[in-house]
Structures are given as structure tokens and as C-alpha cells.
């Protein structure tokens, strides 16, 4: 993609150390938005920029008191279902300005207004790219704000139904194969021959056969 002159931005809910454990080629990207929009990472220089306030210590202390298992990034606090009710009550009781985002069983806590979409906007501003020129891929709850920011929103075949309903394109293939499916068309003719209705129909036919 980069030899074609296009920019590559990875937008993820993972913390950078966790991301590096599962994927060690972040240098392939111009920028990385990590922690669900809280952190901007520049692979060329290794520089990290926090895009929000760090988690309040009072909130972390309350989670420890309540024996909630969690991990902490520079801007994100993450735990898992079924702890969301305890987390929401802690936020309410403390009166801290935090919100909860779900991601396939993960429960992510961030400052209000911070999400993948706001992180992408920060990356695009740095790159000088309009959101109208962005093709984004998603599959989970935390991708709603992200895909809403993209000019062309793509949901892979294994994405949640609610995400598919709002996507411009739904791929035939799942996971990375679905991403590759669209990228091939993008490199070939900038998606000129990519008919969203055709791909949605393919998904409907696949469901009928099951």
C-alpha cells in the first residue's frame, strides 16, 4: 500500500506493549492509534503522544478495593465482562468523567469523548488527509465511531450485525481475508468496481444457506 503513495494507519483498542507482542511490524504503518483512541504512536521515531488525560488514580484505587481485575495503559483502563456493572457504578459514585466502550467481551474505560474516531481524526490531521478519503475496516462494537469517521466504512463478514448495517461495504471473506479483498480492489481501481449492494447480497445469500 505505501509504495502506491497511500497512507496506512492502524487503529486499535490494544495497548502498545500488547500490540507489539502479537504484531512486530508496526513500521509498516505511517501512524498507529492505540488504546482505543487514547494514544498516537509514530513508528518512524518511536514517539508516543497521549491524546487524553491519564486514568484518575481515585478510579484505579476504587477498582482495586472492589477486586476488579484490570490492566492500565497510558489513557485506557481495561477489564472484561461481567465486571461492567461494577465499573459503571464506580464511575457514578466517584463522579469522574469517564465512559465505557465494549469490544467483544472487553470493557474499556476512557475519558469521555475519547474513542477510535477521535484518535483517527488526530492521525489524519497530522498526515494532512481528509476523512472523506479514508477507507476503514472494522468488526466490533468499538468500531462504530471509527467507521463513522471514514469516508468509506467496511465491515468484514464476521463483523457484528449492527456494524454491517451501517457499513458502506460488507466483505465476502472474514477477518484479514476480508480486508485483503477490499485492498486488492482499492489498488486496482480505487474501488470503482466495488458494488456495496453486491457484497451485502452475498452475505444475505450466505446466511440463507446456513
Please place each PLM-identified region on the residue numbering.
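Generic beta-sheet signal
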Residues: 11, 35, 101-103, 137, ...
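Active-site neighborhood of HAD-like aspartate-dependent phosphohydrolases
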Residues: 1-24
Amino acid at each position: 500500500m505505501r509504495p502506491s503513495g497511500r497512507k496506512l494507519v492502524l487503529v486499535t483498542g490494544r495497548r502498545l506493549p500488547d500490540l507489539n507482542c502479537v504484531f512486530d511490524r508496526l513500521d509498516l504503518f505511517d501512524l498507529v492509534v492505540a488504546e482505543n483512541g487514547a494514544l498516537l504512536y509514530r513508528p518512524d521515531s518511536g514517539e508516543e503522544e497521549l491524546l487524553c488525560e491519564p486514568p484518575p488514580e481515585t478510579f484505579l484505587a476504587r477498582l482495586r478495593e472492589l477486586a476488579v481485575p484490570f490492566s492500565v495503559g497510558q489513557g485506557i483502563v481495561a477489564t472484561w465482562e461481567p465486571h461492567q456493572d461494577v465499573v459503571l457504578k464506580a464511575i457514578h459514585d466517584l463522579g469522574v468523567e469517564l465512559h465505557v466502550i465494549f469490544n467483544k467481551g472487553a470493557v474499556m474505560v476512557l475519558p469521555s469523548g475519547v474513542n477510535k474516531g477521535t484518535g483517527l481524526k488526530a492521525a489524519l490531521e497530522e498526515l494532512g488527509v481528509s476523512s472523506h478519503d479514508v477507507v476503514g475496516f472494522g468488526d466490533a462494537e468499538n468500531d462504530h465511531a471509527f467507521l463513522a469517521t471514514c469516508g468509506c466504512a467496511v465491515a468484514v463478514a464476521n463483523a457484528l450485525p449492527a456494524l454491517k448495517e451501517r457499513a458502506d461495504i460488507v466483505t465476502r471473506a472474514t477477518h484479514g481475508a476480508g480486508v485483503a479483498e477490499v485492498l486488492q480492489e482499492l489498488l486496482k481501481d480505487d474501488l470503482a468496481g466495488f458494488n456495496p449492494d453486491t457484497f451485502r447480497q452475498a452475505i444475505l445469500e450466505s446466511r440463507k444457506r446456513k
